Regions:
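PLP-dependent amino-acid enzyme catalytic core
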Residues: 1-313
Length: 313
């Protein structure tokens, strides 16, 4: 497996995005199951997998001229992309405005504001589409750059270039038998899936959706508590051809697994991480001993303390 995670000296905070560690699970995995490794994306500078796409979207736009000095970056976000854009905007000197449903966790709003971002809230009852509509309205004005994470090819591209390659390197040029991640924008599973399938066409790429709202797999909308996945529409950047199957996880199971990750493995991760690990444990059981599964943990559980899922203070 990959070499130990090492501290290094860097010139800017953005250099601390990527090269996140893989950690093997022990107490949650049964003896007759495949090995399960979690890719802990909270080790990124801004604390989530979305730091990767935020940096690539901004730097790609700088190179092609669509983002100019003095422009304001705007985005509709469930939180993590907004935090990533806020961090990078602060480091590079851009003003950032984010739009998010009011139902998202308070920690995410606070984090964005800490970086100097202006946060606009849309009614929870209107769903994520209302946040996107507001971003589109602002983007029509001059001097605004809309990150468009659901449609921007810089999103899956960075996961192909970095996240997927990191997994391949960790497996000495090969791949695990299965890779699992939740589907929000679809950028992570698309980019990583493409990278892994170039090396091994037989690797299983499994997407995770809420059982209450499996929109990508079944076209069904519904209320759920797994923040960050199942936006209720199909992002244009998703490559369905790279996805071999889906695992549907209830909100209750996702929360319970997130709690168990913290209590039994010492890994504090968010609700969508709980959903992904729930799915990974099922797949590991099906594959059996001697096989390997990698599952991506998008963020840290610290962003969900106010929801009470880990207990009241």
């Amino acid at each position: 497996m990959e070499e130990s995670f090492m501290v290094k000296s860097v010139e800017t905070i953005t250099e601390l995005i990527g090269n996140t560690p893989l950690v093997k699970l022990h107490r949650l995995v049964s003896d007759d199951s495949a090995d399960v490794y979690v890719k802990v994306e909270s080790f990124n500078a801004g604390g989530s997998v979305k730091d990767r796409i935020a940096l690539n979207i901004i730097e790609t736009a700088e190179k092609d001229g669509s983002l100019k000095p003095g422009d304001t970056i705007i985005e509709a976000t469930s939180g993590n992309t907004g935090v990533g854009l806020s961090l990078i905007g602060a480091a590079k000197g851009y003003k950032v405005i984010t739009i998010m449903p009011e139902s998202m966790s308070i920690e995410r709003r606070q984090l964005m504001k800490a970086y100097g971002t202006e946060v606009l809230l849309t009614p929870a009852a209107d769903g994520f589409g209302a946040a996107v509509a507001k971003a589109e309205e602002l983007a029509a004005q001059p001097g605004y750059f809309w990150a468009r994470q659901f449609d921007n090819e810089a999103n899956p591209a960075i996961h192909y270039q970095t996240t997927g390659q990191e997994i391949i390197k960790a497996f000495d040029g090969k791949t695990p038998d299965a890779y699992i991640s939740g589907i929000g924008t679809g950028g992570t599973i698309t980019g990583v899936g493409r990278a892994l399938k170039e090396v091994n066409k037989d690797v299983e790429i499994i997407g995770v959706e809420p059982e209450e709202a499996p929109f990508i797999s079944k076209g069904q909308k519904g209320k759920h508590r797994i923040q960050g996945i199942s936006a209720g529409f199909k992002p244009s950047i998703i490559d369905r051809d790279v996805i071999d199957g889906f695992e549907l996880v209830t909100s209750d199971d996702a929360i319970e697994t997130a709690k168990n990750l913290a209590a039994k493995e010492g890994i504090l991760a968010g609700i969508s991480s709980g959903a992904a690990v729930t799915a990974a444990l099922r797949v590991a059981k099906r594959l059996g001993k001697g096989k390997s599964v990698v599952v991506l943990l998008p963020d840290t559980g610290e962003r969900y303390l106010s929801t009470g899922i880990f207990g009241e203070a």
